[in-house]
């Protein structure tokens, strides 16, 4: 089955959780974009929500599709955030996010949310994080080389993310270092070690944050929770 169809299926299930009057965090990335479109369909049918976008790209899409947007300064709580993930570890449902370049804002909104609902296709499920790709780490541009060397001392192969021949810039004006650690046995410990490095703004490790993961594959939909995941 086409991956886009799977993403749409997961997005529709997640958006079913949105109720009238909710403040909803809007994730970033190809899967989250489907959720924004599905939510916009419900808004056009009369659903009233306020969206909190996690990137300028998501804000543009949501505005174009007619979703009213707000900010964390205006809203004291976020009822539900719907977002994608690059990898989901079975069991505790720890996540790697940030290949779309919005990990800092995604983590801020997720942390402010009552519930974080992750939508993925089954290819994103792994036994251990780091099995498929790099861990993005957002860093200050000043002295990023020193930050990269500190990450290398933790065991990573580090590459500065580039776009159009220049360093990729996040919405906050930061760089992203893509760090290949290999399989990550203890993500919470690694997250803490990375966060202690001067120059690190945020890592793409989301540990203990997902309320549920909605997984779509050719057999249908499965909803994983940290307590019920295999």
Swiss-Prot record:
- Per UniProt, where does substrate bind? 28-31, 83-86, 97-100, 124
Q: What are the positions of the active site?
A: 106
Keyword Nucleotide-binding attributed? no
Q: Which GO terms describe its molecular function?
A: ribose-5-phosphate isomerase activity
Which keywords, in A-to-Z order, does the entry hold? Isomerase
Which InterPro entries does the record cross-reference, listed alphabetically?
NagB/RpiA_transferase-like, Ribose-5P_isomerase, Ribose5P_isomerase_typA_subgr, Ribose5P_isomerase_type_A
Record's catalysed reaction(s)? aldehydo-D-ribose 5-phosphate = D-ribulose 5-phosphate
For biological process, the GO terms are: pentose-phosphate shunt, non-oxidative branch
According to its UniProt record, in which pathway does this protein act?
A: Carbohydrate degradation; pentose phosphate pathway; D-ribose 5-phosphate from D-ribulose 5-phosphate (non-oxidative stage): step 1/1
Enzyme Commission numbers on file: 5.3.1.6
Question: What does this protein do, in the record's words?
Answer: Catalyzes the reversible conversion of ribose-5-phosphate to ribulose 5-phosphate.
Record-stated family: Belongs to the ribose 5-phosphate isomerase family.
- Please give the subunit comment from the record: Homodimer.
Identify this protein by name.
Ribose-5-phosphate isomerase A
Q: Which organism is it from?
A: Gloeobacter violaceus (strain ATCC 29082 / PCC 7421)
Corresponding gene? rpiA
């Amino acid at each position: 089955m086409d991956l886009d169809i799977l993403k749409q299926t997961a997005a529709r299930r997640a958006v079913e959780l949105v109720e009238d009057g909710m403040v909803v965090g809007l994730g970033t990335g190809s899967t989250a974009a489907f959720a924004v479109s599905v939510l916009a369909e419900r808004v056009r049918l009369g659903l009233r929500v306020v969206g909190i976008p996690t990137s300028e790209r998501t804000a543009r899409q949501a505005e174009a599709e007619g979703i009213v947007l707000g900010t964390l300064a205006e809203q004291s709580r976020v009822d539900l955030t719907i977002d994608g993930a690059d990898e989901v570890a079975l069991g505790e449902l720890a996540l790697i996010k940030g290949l779309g370049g919005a990990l800092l804002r995604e983590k801020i909104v997720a942390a402010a949310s009552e519930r974080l609902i992750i939508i993925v296709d089954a290819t994103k499920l792994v036994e251990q994080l780091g099995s498929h790709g790099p861990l993005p780490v957002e860093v200050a541009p000043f002295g990023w080389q020193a930050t990269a060397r500190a990450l290398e001392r933790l065991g990573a192969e580090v590459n500065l993310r580039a776009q159009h021949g220049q360093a990729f810039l996040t919405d906050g004006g930061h760089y992203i270092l893509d760090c290949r650690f290999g399989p990550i046995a203890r993500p919470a410990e690694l997250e803490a070690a990375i966060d202690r490095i001067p120059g690190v703004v945020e890592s793409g490790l989301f540990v203990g944050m997902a309320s549920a993961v909605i997984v779509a594959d050719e057999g249908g939909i499965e909803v994983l929770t940290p307590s019920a995941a295999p």
